[in-house]
From Swiss-Prot:
This is Quinol oxidase subunit 2. A lipid is attached at C26 (S-diacylglycerol cysteine). The chain crosses the membrane at residues 49-69, 90-110. GO terms for biological process: ATP synthesis coupled electron transport. The keyword Metal-binding does not apply. It is found in: Cell membrane; Membrane raft. GO terms for cellular component: membrane raft; plasma membrane. Residues 1-25 form the signal peptide. It catalyses: 2 a quinol + O2 = 2 a quinone + 2 H2O. Its EC number is 1.10.3.-. Residues 294-321 are annotated as: Disordered. Interacts with FloT.
């Protein structure tokens, strides 16, 4: 037993450290707390994969322990029949080749099925008209455009529950990634192209969204709130915003192209009449030049905003959400 303990000691220590670090990272496991059908499918797939792999690891450790105990060197053991010269075993070679292939197939089938099913609206609400939202990443903020409602928000998003949301994702500059963990997985945002993603919230609440792809100095601050409300409350917000929020001018939208953090903003018109970032990958750079922004090294003492002229824009209390 002492020999067995010494042999397994490194593995036991590694297992203990793994448990400590894994549990330490589960304080806010929002991915495993889904609030919509898309996130629920992905969470189920993650748990299935983890359970399947833990089973495989368990089998390996059991076999490893049996071999250690059964074939260990001990006093009185007859080693006369032992032959260290082994030149292959067809049966074993077939087994350890076929088993990994079967494992990969077993994991691939549900994974591929889930990935393809997520490219469509959730099954439970596929007959409902999706709410279309253009999500545009700009260093370091998120701009959300509602073309049907002619509304645009910055750094927050209002959506109705029990209705599919079709995101049209793009970027004005750096390659980013839209991620709302409790509603679904991340999808890349790239300049000059649109990526579609269906998400849906089933419960009223506020969910955290963020950029999941590093984009520079203030990447960690590129977050936004997703407010999932009832259809009635959503329609009330739309009506109030259309009547009370200011229009989005081209000059103001150009200012949003500057690489900086801003507060939540609300407008009663969208930037879609000025530019389609899914087609125009240069608009942000041109807007910065028009405003006098000079890109410099992050180690430089020069202020890149030194020559920038901006129109001060103050949100009214009525438009703050």
């Amino acid at each position: 037993m002492i020999f067995l303990f010494r042999a397994l000691k490194p593995l036991l220590v590694l297992a203990l450290l793994t448990v400590v670090f894994v549990l330490g990272g589960c304080s806010n496991a929002s991915v495993l707390d889904p609030k919509g059908p898309v996130a629920e499918q992905q969470s189920d797939l993650i748990l299935l994969s983890i359970g399947f792999m833990l089973f495989i690891v368990g089998v390996v450790f059991v076999l490893f322990t049996i071999i250690l105990v059964k074939y260990r060197d001990r006093k009185g053991k007859d080693n006369g029949s032992y032959n260290p010269e082994i030149h292959g075993n067809t049966f074993l070679e077939v087994v350890w080749t076929v088993i990994p292939i079967l494992i990969v197939i077993a994991l691939s089938v549900p994974t591929v099925q889930t990935i393809y099913s997520l490219e469509k609206a959730p099954e439970a609400t596929k007959d409902k008209e999706p709410l279309v939202v253009y999500a545009t990443s700009v260093d370091w903020k998120w701009v959300f455009s509602y073309p049907e409602q002619d509304i645009e928000t910055v750094n927050y998003l209002n959506i109705p529950v029990d209705r599919p949301i079709l995101f049209k994702i793009s970027s004005a500059d750096s390659m980013a990634s839209l991620w709302i963990p409790q509603l679904g997985g991340q999808k890349y945002a790239m300049a000059g192209m649109l990526m579609d993603q269906y998400l849906q919230a089933d419960k009223v609440g506020t969910y955290e969204g963020r950029n999941a792809n590093f984009t520079g100095e203030h990447f960690a601050d590129q977050e936004f709130d997703v407010n999932a409300v009832t259809e009635k409350d959503f329609n009330s917000w739309v009506k109030k915003t259309q009547n009370e929020a200011p229009k989005l001018t081209k000059e103001k939208y150009d200012e949003l192209m500057l690489p900086e953090n801003v507060d939540e903003l609300t407008f009663s018109s969208t930037h879609l009449k000025y530019v389609d970032h899914g087609q125009d990958a240069e608009y942000a750079m041109e807007a910065r030049k028009r405003l006098g922004y000079q890109a410099v090294s992050p180690h430089s003492k020069t202020d890149p905003f030194e020559n920038v002229k901006k129109n001060e824009f103050k949100k009214s209390d009525d438009t703050e959400e």
